[in-house]
């Protein structure tokens, strides 16, 4: 019997993932990664519910202390990024460095498991011609989480299961109710756990970063106002600037050296291309020539046509078919062919358009 270790957050999605695998005859064991430091943090309630789900199913339950790894790989990473004037994407980093890789190692080494599973909304498909495990969007496009999974290596994808990939969220809740799972009515959690635990992302950052007032300037360097700390701002931001102006202004650059926030009009916020680093090719091997794809530059943004040009050193250049707004260093650019996730990387440089938009 195949043994599968299911990552349990204590929410309805991971609970149903475990229950479905258990019902399909897998030897299921539950596992929760203890991530947050300090008493009464988010994991405590989740661990209670996760343990309860495993008790309901009559399967073993394990807790792995990952607090130091989470602090170094996620908390420190996010804080250092905002201090440097970028907007980091902790979720994809967490999936690779804290969750999937370490959980798979623990499951295979300590629990002698064959695979791991999670409650993410994504699908997998084996390609017999290439030997690769392809990552596909979930059936429920509104819940699709492949954007956050682009950085998973083939070694992980070949040993993971996503039981919810063919389900919609309402179907997941219906299954939870039918099975009498204690998490069936549990409210949806925020995508970003740091914001959920601290009340907001701003509150989290203020805990770690000293706010230093500085200037808000236009592209010529003319001072338009004051800011409360560069970590309170992100590229493309329009609200909360506190500037009276004849036309809407957007954050177009953050200068940590001069402690300045640079703003401009909508045209100034448009980018014609960007470069990405730490590229991970997922469903295909790195191509030898440019490819046409649809790129997504934020979790909730719509994919747009682009040309992806592979570069040396795990980098790529992305040319947008039409100028795009709010392309933000530190966020991920993830490119698809239909539902198939081809690859992705972290945006590190943008080129502004000179054409009217």
UniProtKB/Swiss-Prot annotation:
InterPro entries: MnmA-like (IPR004506), MnmA-like_C (IPR046885), MnmA-like_central (IPR046884), MnmA-like_central_sf (IPR023382), Rossmann-like_a/b/a_fold (IPR014729). It is found in: Cytoplasm. The gene is mnmA. Keywords: ATP-binding, Cytoplasm, Disulfide bond, Nucleotide-binding, RNA-binding, Transferase, tRNA processing, tRNA-binding. Belongs to the MnmA/TRMU family. This is tRNA-specific 2-thiouridylase MnmA. NCBIfam families: PRK00143.1, trmU. It catalyses: S-sulfanyl-L-cysteinyl-[protein] + uridine(34) in tRNA + AH2 + ATP = 2-thiouridine(34) in tRNA + L-cysteinyl-[protein] + A + AMP + diphosphate + H(+). The lineage of its organism: Bacteria, Bacillati, Cyanobacteriota, Cyanophyceae, Synechococcales. The active site is at residues 94, 193. It is an enzyme of class 2 (transferase). PANTHER family: MITOCHONDRIAL TRNA-SPECIFIC 2-THIOURIDYLASE 1, TRNA 5-METHYLAMINOMETHYL-2-THIOURIDYLATE -METHYLTRANSFERASE.
């Amino acid at each position: 019997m195949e043994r599968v270790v299911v990552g349990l957050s204590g929410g309805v999605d991971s609970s149903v993932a475990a229950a479905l695998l258990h019902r399909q005859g897998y030897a299921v064991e539950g596992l929760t990664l203890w991530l947050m430091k300090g008493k009464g943090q988010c994991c405590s309630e989740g661990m209670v519910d996760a343990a309860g789900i495993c008790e309901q199913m009559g399967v073993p339950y394990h807790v792995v202390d990952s607090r130091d790894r989470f602090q170094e790989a996620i908390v420190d990473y996010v804080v250092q990024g905002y201090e440097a004037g970028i907007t980091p994407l902790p979720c994809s980093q967490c999936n690779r460095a804290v969750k999937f890789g370490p959980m798979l190692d623990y499951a295979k080494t300590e629990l002698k498991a064959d695979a791991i599973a999670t409650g993410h909304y994504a699908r997998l498909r084996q390609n017999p011609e290439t030997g690769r495990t392809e990552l596909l969007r979930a059936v429920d496009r509104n819940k699709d989480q492949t954007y956050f999974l682009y950085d998973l290596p083939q070694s992980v994808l070949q040993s993971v299961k996503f039981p919810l990939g063919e389900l919609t969220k309402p179907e997941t809740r219906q299954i939870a109710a039918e099975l009498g799972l204690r998490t069936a009515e549990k409210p949806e959690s925020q995508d970003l756990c740091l914001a959920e635990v601290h009340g907001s992302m701003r509150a989290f950052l203020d805990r770690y970063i000293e706010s230093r007032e500085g200037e808000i300037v236009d592209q010529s360097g003319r001072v338009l106002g004051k800011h409360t700390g560069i970590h309170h701002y992100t590229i493309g931001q329009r609200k909360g600037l506190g500037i009276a102006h004849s036309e809407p202004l957007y954050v177009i650059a953050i200068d940590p050296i001069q402690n300045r926030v640079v703003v401009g009009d909508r045209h100034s916020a448009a980018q014609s291309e960007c470069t990405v680093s730490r590229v991970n090719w997922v469903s295909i091997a790195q191509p030898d020539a440019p490819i046409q794809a649809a790129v997504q530059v934020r979790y909730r943004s719509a994919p747009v046509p682009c040309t992806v040009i592979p570069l040396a050193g795990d980098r790529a250049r992305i040319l947008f078919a039409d100028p795009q707004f709010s392309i933000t260093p530190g966020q991920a650019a993830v490119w698809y062919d239909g539902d198939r996730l081809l690859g992705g990387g972290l945006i590190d440089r943008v080129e502004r358009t000179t054409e009217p938009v």
